Amino acid sequence: MEILPAIDLLDGACVRLHKGDYEQVTRFSDDPVAQALSWQQQGATRLHLVDLDGAKRGEPVNDSAVQAITSALDIPVQLGGGVRSLERAEQLLACGLDRVILGTVAIEQPDLVRSLAERYPGRIVVGIDAKDGRVATRGWIEQSDVLATDLARTFSSSGIAAIITTDIATDGTLAGPNLEALRTMAASSSVPVIASGGIGCMADLLSLLPLEPLGVSGVIVGRALYDGRVDLAEAVRALAEPRLQDITAVAADLA
């Protein structure tokens, strides 16, 4: 299972939001390039970027920081937040990003997502952010009536690389992942699922391992890394070489 360190960009700085609330911001670093290089040096195999300004406003704000990060790193970088047009997606892919993540546009213009997935195989990811099982859009500001699992099913045969599913209620809380929601999401789609939200310790990461055979292929971690609750190098080793006793113990707890 792949672990993806997250860098959330707001006004050019690395921050974290609590449950997606733009009024509850914790600032971790004013140098996102240095932070990205640190994650790479600690063993990250892919970096996850979120343009929070773009997600909220629907327009690019942090492009200079994104360009600097992709230029400095050797590992692939993916980005989401405010990618709501064909032109914007192609612009980002051309600037060195390995993957772009489409969230709001996936519910508003699903045909655009399919078109991009066909044009750029393996480089388009759908981000499904959910609260109480229903999709939230536009930087989590708006709540829809669409079930997250229904949206996932619509992209099962579209050619997208993965689905990133974020449980808004646990994001930034360190309270642990919503395992049942992840299990349901994985069962709803034939494409790999990447978990996001709630990771607070190594045990939380290990709790995801029984879901890997169901299709949960990766996990995004943010605040737990910045707070020092999870050591990235240790986490990379643990998820790359699952320890049978840990998986068995967690599986027993889930049963």
Swiss-Prot record:
Any idea what this protein is called?
1-(5-phosphoribosyl)-5-[(5-phosphoribosylamino)methylideneamino] imidazole-4-carboxamide isomerase
**Recorded name of the encoding gene:** hisA
Q: What does the record give as EC number?
A: 5.3.1.16
Keyword list (alphabetical) reads:
Amino-acid biosynthesis, Cytoplasm, Histidine biosynthesis, Isomerase
Biological process annotations from GO: L-histidine biosynthetic process; L-tryptophan biosynthetic process
> Quick one: which pathway?
Amino-acid biosynthesis; L-histidine biosynthesis; L-histidine from 5-phospho-alpha-D-ribose 1-diphosphate: step 4/9
A Pfam family name for this chain? His_biosynth
What's the top EC group for this one? isomerase
PANTHER family assigned to the protein according to its UniProt record, in alphabetical order: 1-(5-PHOSPHORIBOSYL)-5-[(5-PHOSPHORIBOSYLAMINO)METHYLIDENEAMINO] IMIDAZOLE-4-CARBOXAMIDE ISOMERASE
Chief location category = cytoplasm
**Paired cysteines (S-S):** none
Is Cytoplasm one of the keywords? yes
